[in-house]
UniProtKB/Swiss-Prot annotation:
Enzyme Commission designation: 3.1.3.4
Disulfide feature: none
GO CC term, one of those recorded: nucleus
Protein name: Phosphatidate phosphatase LPIN2
Short motif DXDXT motif, span: 689-693
Keywords on record: Congenital dyserythropoietic anemia, Cytoplasm, Disease variant, Endoplasmic reticulum, Fatty acid metabolism, Hereditary hemolytic anemia, Hydrolase, Lipid metabolism, Membrane, Nucleus, Phosphoprotein, Transcription, Transcription regulation
Subcellular location: Nucleus; Cytoplasm, Cytosol; Endoplasmic reticulum membrane
Single biological process term from Gene Ontology: positive regulation of transcription by RNA polymerase II
Length: 896
């Protein structure tokens, strides 16, 4: 009985560890890549399917994936998507190519982009420059954040030295964090769980909010990294931005259900199965056609959906739209004299959420972050159980605005005050360096474990990838159609100015900079609304068509139409008979500027300016044309490399080890290993299934090897080794999920039949999630869907006139169907049953085995000659195919 109890306990422990290893949140994996060298020397490759799991919320600079091939780093990088998928970024071939929203992305951030605007002067909330503080901060940057290859090497040495001592501390920290860091998932505590964060998260938020004080990248692109995500839009509970390690509770939908809504097909990107792309494009919500003008205002009308339950809200989410109201036009003096005129239009949810998101702390101008917003809720203090101070690897793509928590302790109080000013809503002042309560003391493992245990899920960082939105009252455009940066920064609007008078959006001089391009409020509002509601930017094609088709041609507030010299000459003439601008007392306090600070034409009211422009256009109508602002280069996602890019990788024939790694500040480095196989255009491939073909059964073949039990068919390793010795390449194709790549790859390396191992070959798995693959293979029993897509893609890498697949091994009729669809001759399709009986599809009555087929390897799989492209000059007429064809049926009546 003791033996039985010990065995049962061992099985339970092993299964528990196995379950932890296949947790969907940690399912990182990499599917092997096949590169085929063509006859002309060019290259073609299969898609790079790489997935990272449980990385939390990342900022754009931390979404860069480094690649190492055969132990050497290559000058090639990937980017991380919202669902953990990795992809390459390439420029579109056509300048105005229309891209689907799920393919649109931004370029990979590089180190140079973060050093462009270092010399930008800091501005106080009142608008005064502080050169002394700017110089102090630039000095800190020069001494603290600029890193060289030698410093990177030192960090690697320290990291290796620290790695051995940190393992024990990580286990203790994660165990202690589960007791102290409590994340609630009940419906009553949802709001409190999102609002009440520890002092660690508060410090991280403050650090993240202060980063735009130092740097504003000049290159912004109007396309985000968002794709069809299963995460549904919920009403935000807090007005402050989420930190880099913040979790959001999703009680309405479990992890299993949310994962089942994702579909990731071969060669594509993850998509939501709730609403397909076609349904999204064909679905027309109940909205009214809106003609934008200078007097167009935007107001959110609260609908009855707020009172619907969580379940009913999911069903009605598609029909919930924001109504845009166009009020009657009024004079500028009336608008600006009443600061609360626009505030009355804005409902409380809009004030606390939308406006704060428009002026998100990560994307405010320099002066807007001098003090924290007053609406930010004080965060509760949480004592950190871990005193661990790790040295993480710093990615070369993280710009100088990244600062490590250990470095914060060494900052002087004056410099630290620039990063972390006192919050207005916090009761009492907090002393700056608290050695034991700093946010970095808590290990990231504890946060991840708490999320996995409590049912929470780390949000994708589509919200963290919002653009840099800046407001200014500079007004107008120069003759070349662009606004100078100095003029824009001179009249920038701070948070306090906007908070005191939200009616600034009605000011005709308001200019909004998004993606380094300048808009007025009528055009910027839909873009900001899309970012807030859907966490996605409007596609470039939509913005361009909106500018071309919807923009009024006779409006003084649309600044995307080029002013000709004749227009600029007529404007001063028409201004001579006009009244002067209203006095400064009628304007809001935030819009008052020193004398001579603005051009004369910007002091006129909106009605006067529009009338003047309309008169000038009426006198001399000139056909206008859109003016492109900033860079017109767009970028799209890709899973394949071009021939030139593959040539730079310097692959050698056969397997090449590849490692994909991503480094974050708070979670260290996550690595994912795979193999790139370089084959020739005339190679012959043997396809082999895994579950039920190499193993004795489908289900037990995945479980028993993890328990140490050999569940492999006898003689298969020897057979495959003999076939490989004759010059054939092996391809292992299974419908398992990408998250089981490491487990499956380890099993193939583990198989050993009396010293004979399986030949190495690419492992082709389904890129979908674990539960989707399990549902397709076990419940639907249609694994051939994936196999046909995958094998057809591999087949297309070779010459069109060649058939790369020579033979195939499987265990089900589904496998036979898939192999037949990709062109494998049925005389070389073999299936095996759980008893180990091998059956040839052409002669099903003749049963054999792996051992017997090994004796006929030289005949069935003859040695491939290097001078020939196949085993025989005419393989279709060999003695194993042609002479074994059935005798054709002949109608005796026709012979008589």
């Amino acid at each position: 009985m003791n033996y039985v109890g010990q065995l049962a306990g061992q099985v339970i422990v092993t299964v528990k560890e196995l379950y932890k290893g296949i947790n969907q949140a940690t399912l990182s994996g990499c599917i092997d890549v096949i590169v085929v060298q063509q006859q002309d020397g060019s290259y073609q490759c299969s898609p790079f399917h790489v997935r990272f799991g449980k990385l939390g919320v990342l900022r754009s600079k931390e979404k860069v994936i480094d690649i190492e091939i055969n132990g050497s780093a290559v000058d090639l990088h990937m980017k991380l998507g919202d669902n953990g998928e990795a992809f390459f970024v390439e420029e579109t071939e056509e300048e105005y190519e229309k891209l689907p929203a799920y393919l649109a992305t931004s370029p990979i951030p590089t180190e140079d982009q973060f050093f462009k605007d270092i010399d930008t002067p800091l501005v106080k909330s009142g608008g005064d420059e502080t050169p002394s503080q700017s110089s102090d901060i630039s000095h800190v940057l020069e001494t603290e954040t600029i890193f060289t290859p030698s410093s990177v090497k030192k960090k690697k040495r320290r990291r290796k030295k620290y790695k051995q001592d940190s393992k024990k501390e990580e286990q203790a920290a994660s165990a202690a964090a589960e007791d102290t860091c409590d994340v609630g998932v009940s419906s009553d505590d949802d709001k409190g769980a999102q609002a009440a964060r520890g002092s660690s998260n508060a410090s991280l938020k403050e650090e993240e909010c202060k980063e735009p004080l130092l740097f504003h990248s000049g290159d912004h692109y109007p396309l985000s990294d968002g794709d069809w995500s299963p995460l549904e839009t919920t009403y935000p509970q807090t007005a402050c931005p989420k930190s880099d390690s913040e979790l959001e509770v999703k009680p309405a939908e479990s992890l299993l259900r949310s994962e089942s809504h994702m579909e990731w097909t071969w060669g594509g990107f993850p998509e939501s199965t709730k609403v397909s792309k076609r349904e999204r494009s064909d679905h027309h919500p109940r909205t009214a056609t809106i003609t934008p003008s200078e007097n167009t205002h935007f107001r959110v009308i609260p609908s009855e959906d707020n009172l619907i339950s969580e379940v009913e809200k999911d069903a009605s989410m598609e029909d919930t739209v924001c109504t845009i109201v166009k009020p009657k036009p009024r004079a500028l003096g009336t608008q600006m004299s009443d600061p609360t005129s626009v505030a009355e239009l804005l409902e409380p949810p809009l004030e606390s959420t939308q406006i704060s998101s428009m002026l998100d702390a990560d994307h405010l101008p320099n002066a807007a972050l001098a003090e924290a917003p007053s609406e930010s809720k004080p965060a509760a203090k949480v004592d950190s159980p871990s005193k661990k101070k790790g040295v993480h690897k710093r990615s070369q793509h993280q710009g100088p605005d990244d600062i490590y928590l250990d470095d914060l302790k060494g900052l002087e109080p004056e410099v630290a005050a620039l990063y972390f000013p006192k919050s207005e809503s916090e009761p009492g002042s907090r002393q700056w360096p608290e050695s034991d309560t700093l946010s970095g003391s808590q290990s990231p493992q504890s946060v991840g474990s708490a999320a996995a245990d409590s049912g929470t899920e780390c949000l994708s960082d589509s919200a963290m990838d919002l653009p840099d939105v800046t407001l200014s009252l500079c007004g107008g455009l120069s003759e070349n159609g662009e606004i100078s940066k100095e003029k824009f920064m001179e009249h920038i609007i701070t948070y306090h100015e906007f908070a005191e008078n939200p009616g600034l959006i009605d000011n005709p001089n308001l200019v909004i900079r998004i993606y380094n391009r300048y808009y007025n409020w009528a055009l910027a509002a839909p873009m900001i609304l899309s970012l807030q509601v859907f966490q996605k930017s409007l596609p470039k094609a939509t913005v361009e068509s909106w500018v071309k088709d919807k923009m009024p041609k006779k409006s003084g507030r649309w600044w995307f139409w080029r002013k000709r010299e004749s227009m600029t000459k007529q404007l001063p003439e028409s201004k001579e008979g006009k009244s002067e601008a209203p006095p400064a007392s009628d304007l809001p306090s935030s819009s008052k500027e020193p004398a001579g600070a603005r051009p004369a034409e910007n002091d006129s009211s909106s009605d006067e300016g529009s009338q003047e422009l309309e008169e000038s256009i009426t006198v001399d109508p000139i056909p206008t044309e859109p003016l492109s602002h900033g860079s017109t280069t767009s970028y799209k996602k890709s899973l394949r490399l071009s021939s030139d890019q593959i040539a730079k990788l310097k692959l050698h024939d056969g397997p090449n080890d590849v490692v994909f790694s991503i480094t974050t500040q708070y979670q260290g480095t996550c690595r994912c290993a795979g193999t790139i196989y370089l084959w020739n255009w005339n190679d012959k491939i043997i396809i082999s299934d895994i579950d039920g073909t190499i193993t004795k059964s489908d289900a037990l073949g995945q479980i028993l090897p993890q328990l140490g039990k050999d569940w492999t068919h006898q003689g298969i390793a020897k057979l495959y080794h003999s076939i490989n010795e004759n010059g054939y390449k092996f391809l292992y194709c299974s419908a398992r999920a990408i998250g089981m790549a490491d487990m499956t790859r380890g099993y193939l390396h583990w198989v050993n039949d009396k010293g004979t191992i399986l030949p190495r070959g690419p492992l082709m798995l389904s890129p979908s999630s674990l539960f989707s693959a399990f549902h397709r293979e076990v419940i639907e029993k249609k694994p051939e869907k994936f196999k046909i897509e995958c094998l057809n893609d591999i087949k297309n890498l070779f010459a069109p006139s060649k058939q790369p697949f020579y033979a195939a091994f499987g265990n089900r009729p589904n496998d036979v169907y898939a192999y037949t669809q990709v062109g494998v001759p049925d005389c070389r399709i073999f299936t095996v049953n759980p008893k180990g009986e091998l059956i040839q599809e052409r002669t099903k009555g003749n049963k054999s085995s792996y051992h017997r087929l090994s004796e006929l390897v030289e005949h069935v799989f003859p040695l491939l000659s290097k001078e020939q492209n196949s085993a025989f000059p005419c393989p279709e007429f060999s003695s194993f195919c042609y002479w074994r064809d059935p005798i054709p049926e002949v109608d005796l009546d026709d012979l008589s």
